[in-house]
Amino acid sequence: MEIKEEGASEEGQHFLPTAQASDPGDCQFTSIQKTPNEPQLEFILACKDLVAPVRDRKLNTLVQISVIHPVEQSLTRYSSTEIVEGTRDPLFLTGVTFPSEYPIYEETKIKLTVYDVKDKSHDTVRTSVLPEHKDSPPEIGRSFLGYASFKVGELLKSKEQLLVLSLRTSDGGKVVGTIEVSVVKMGEIEDGEADHITTDIQGQKCALVCECTAPESVSGKDNLPFLNSVLKNPVCKLYRFPTSDNKWMRIREQMSESILSFHIPKELISLHIKEDLCRNQEIKELGELSPHWDNLRKNVLTHCDQMVNMYQDILTELSKETGSSFKSSSSKGDKTLEFVPINLHLQRMQVHSPHLKDALYDVITVGAPAAHFQGFKNGGLRKLLHRFETERRNTGYQFIYYSPENTAKAKEVLSNINQLQPLIATHADLLLNSASQHSPDSLKNSLKMLSEKTELFVHAFKDQLVRSALLALYTARPGGILKKPPSPKSSTEESSPQDQPPLMRGQDSIPHHSDYDEEEWDRVWANVGKSLNCIIAMVDKLIERDGGSEGSGGNNDGEKEPSLADAIPSHPREDWYEQLYPLILTLKDCMGEVVNRAKQSLTFVLLQELAYSLPQCLMLTLRRDVVFSQALAGLVCGFIIKLQTSLYDPGFLRQLHTVGLIVQYEGLLSTYSDEIGMLEDMAVGISDLKKVAFKIIEAKSNDVLPVITGRREHYVVEVKLPARMFESLPLQIKEGQLLHVYPVLFNVGINEQQTLAERFGDVSLQESINQENFELLQEYYKIFMEKMPPDYISHFQEQNDLKALLENLLQNIQSKKRKNVEIMWLAATICRKLNGIRFTCCKSAKDRTSMSVTLEQCSILRDEHQLHKDFFIRALDCMRREGCRIENVLKNIKCRKYAFNMLQLMAFPKYYRPPEGTYGKADT
């Protein structure tokens, strides 16, 4: 049968089309017995006695792995090893792994083709289609040596699952050496036998022993189906590296997309639409306004309706992306995808070493949250928000200025009103239901809940802002006289002006009006409390006459006003409902009047914010929503993964509900040209994540995707866990305690643009961000040390000298050293030791991010797992040349080249430079 070769533009990592995978003919093939959610097959390679085409030539060899699919008998290039230089007996550190979803069977044939690489600068894994058994053209810098093939079943059924195959030339005749194929099972003891293999690396002999001890489970495998509902399209790579005592450790590298890339933005946009529609309706219901304010309202509503329509259009377009879980870097300027994070992936390294427990290291890689479609001509959010607020503070007489704090407070009170009013109505109805049943215990419990919610309701209106807003709205009514331009006055609601210039204090400018009766609001507001007291007194009286227990079990205010109880006439027992009903009706009426007045006044506050500088203020809101959406999608992904991997760690769970989690972002953006605006966007987007809290709930169905509730000032992300996992949580978390995160950002530009910024430009933005976020990190550490139990802290301090690390980080931040990447290394180390969530970001999370995460992985292997010092650079090159990150580049731009040139790399720190042959001109 003729075998045809398919192009490998995806290098075999994107699985075959569904139609092929589900072909009815598949049933005749034998599936591989496998552990759920684990790779189906992993093996390592070594060659011996290779014959050079030219006498005395030292070979630089690599092996290309191809798969012959039994259904169509087509051949697909799958992966390659690294290049091993200067030996005829190469032992390859890069293995081969087939993920759990890959369509592979015992009948599947694997072809191994060995090449001699003559020029690494021109070599990369080919993506073009070449005829089978044809030597590569000489211009790509390598020549064909030999090939061998085997069926997967032959390997699995062989003795010790090891095959030694002869390598033959293209005509199948001459033997040019042998190749060993050995199955790898992460974490299994290899029958206690050692496989001594000698390799010649850079002229040094190194005897390597391949043996591993039995591992402990890295993460509960029961949790993996839950994680797989969030992660998609895994790319897996396998390595073996020597330790300092010449034993093998094995590393599995994995990169996965997340369906949260699209799910979270859609959830968030839906909330924005709901919130904005509600706000627009409240503005319409402000009542009659003077011509000046009415014209402003009409203008605001016109623009706000346009904004809602735009959000609805974006949501419609996103809803069409039903199968998407990834936004490529080349789509970062696409308007319909601007809410979606760029190139979001989980980058995971699993380590199995001879003497240490198995370990997982996760980093979320994502493009810097930024509004690429809107551009950066005028800067990013940090600059734009500051400029907008300064101009609004100095606006003319036609507006009333409210500080950002008071505008946020107005939104908070409005949100509380909308939540509490229906709750109070529900508890009031439950109280009446208890009364109709003549149940004293039920009556007391219902009263307690009603009292608690009503007290929260009354407390929401204690803020002076409500009073000032009522006055402002009064002057905006027809006949309201605004005698002079608003002038700042001191008021108790003002925030501290210490962060503002003396001449630009953020004081609200509220008009005065002599005819306004301020006491009227006090009377309306107080009526709610009085109505509640009457209900409490009545319940006390009813229970007392019924011979119930003393006291209402609710609020003690009834004891302070005995006259209320004394004034209640005696009634028969069967009249409980009739006696409480008019009091409940009065409470609802009083509450309705308060809600109506407060809603209108606080909505008028929001009108001031919107009325100024239309449509610029709405465009700022859009920009902030876009950036926040990208940041939140990454955060939710990181939180779920961290929860899954640490679910059975009591210390982590205690930290989660006692302190919260540190979320550390590593930025690699320069402070030059457009990337300044990106960094300004990113800084605000990450800071806004403080508004997010998490709540873990039990999943009631197979749908475990997170749900978001709330509004722009405060969001709650509900993470669903299957019942078995949910039961393992501490009581505080199971009862719904909100879990908080502490986001911090440290940025160090590393490219040639940063060189220009350091020599001819300004790096103050980077310095300010790093200093501000160090203070946030230090504050988290202080809370951590105060709130965690003493026995935990004692053990923690024995294992980690975090105080010294923080001091070192501060010194590096203050040192003003150019491209001081030690800032990032220290911040990442501190984050890991604090059980935090790690992020690495550059413009598109493709090139600079790849250099950073691979360096971090190899540094961890060296510092934590005793990677042999002579193999550090080689391990780094393996991961960059044949690892997950080069696959990431391919996914994004359909080209297996990091987008660097030689001139750019001269400006990069030494260990951030990719190996020769992996970079060059690429369309990004």
From Swiss-Prot:
This protein's GO CC annotations: cytoplasm
Keyword Transport: no
CDD domains: C2A_Copine (cd04048)
Annotated stretches, region: Disordered: 1-25, 481-516, 546-569
Name the UniProt record assigns to this protein: Type II inositol 3,4-bisphosphate 4-phosphatase
Coiled coil: none
Reactions catalysed: a 1,2-diacyl-sn-glycero-3-phospho-(1D-myo-inositol-3,4-bisphosphate) + H2O = a 1,2-diacyl-sn-glycero-3-phospho-(1D-myo-inositol-3-phosphate) + phosphate; 1D-myo-inositol 1,3,4-trisphosphate + H2O = 1D-myo-inositol 1,3-bisphosphate + phosphate; 1D-myo-inositol 3,4-bisphosphate + H2O = 1D-myo-inositol 3-phosphate + phosphate
An MF annotation (GO) of this entry: inositol-3,4-bisphosphate 4-phosphatase activity
Listed pathway(s): Signal transduction; phosphatidylinositol signaling pathway
C2 domain segment(s): 23-165
Record EC number: 3.1.3.66
UniProt cross-references to InterPro entries, sorted A to Z: C2_dom, C2_domain_sf, INPP4
Keyword Zinc: no
Protein activity control: Strongly inhibited by inositol hexakisphosphate.
Purpose of the protein: Catalyzes the hydrolysis of the 4-position phosphate of phosphatidylinositol 3,4-bisphosphate, inositol 1,3,4-trisphosphate and inositol 3,4-bisphosphate. Plays a role in the late stages of macropinocytosis by dephosphorylating phosphatidylinositol 3,4-bisphosphate in membrane ruffles. Antagonizes the PI3K-AKT/PKB signaling pathway by dephosphorylating phosphoinositides and thereby modulating cell cycle progression and cell survival.
Biased composition (Basic and acidic residues): 1-13
Enzyme type, top EC level: hydrolase
SUPFAM superfamilies per record: C2 domain (Calcium/lipid-binding domain, CaLB)
Keyword annotations of the record: Hydrolase, Lipid metabolism
Family: Belongs to the inositol 3,4-bisphosphate 4-phosphatase family.
